Amino acid sequence: PQLLILDEPANYLDLLYQKQVFDLIREWVKKPGRAVVSVVHDLSLAKAYGTNAVLMHRGRIISSGSVGEVLSKANLRVAYDMDIYEWMNKMLSQWQ
């Protein structure tokens, strides 16, 4: 196939296997003419592995474009009705 359409391809996997799945997808898509469209709710995975994104809230598109543009603090606040950056930093600080 030249196009993979995936719905949460690493859902319920341990972290090691999530990384392996996305590393395999990244290698597969490097060949010319190939593309991947994937639903991913894990923002860290989307940011690490995605190139373009569509951010939705209540069935409507809020933003689409490069991952960096789409996953901005302002867009995420609209999508999640909270400061995602603050929450994720708080969660990460537990590991430091």
Summary of predicted features, one role per range:
Residues 4-8:
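Catalytic Walker B motif of ABC-type/P-loop ATPase nucleotide-binding domains
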Residues 15-17:
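Helix N-cap at the start of a conserved alpha-helix in ABC-type nucleotide-binding domains
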Residues 19-31:
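Helical segment within the ABC ATPase nucleotide-binding domain
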Residues 40-41:
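H-loop/switch region of ABC-family ATPase nucleotide-binding domains
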Residues 46-48:
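A short, surface-exposed alpha-helical micro-motif characterized by mixed small hydrophobic
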Residues 64-65:
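ABC ATPase "signature
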Residues 73-96:
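ABC ATPase nucleotide-binding domains
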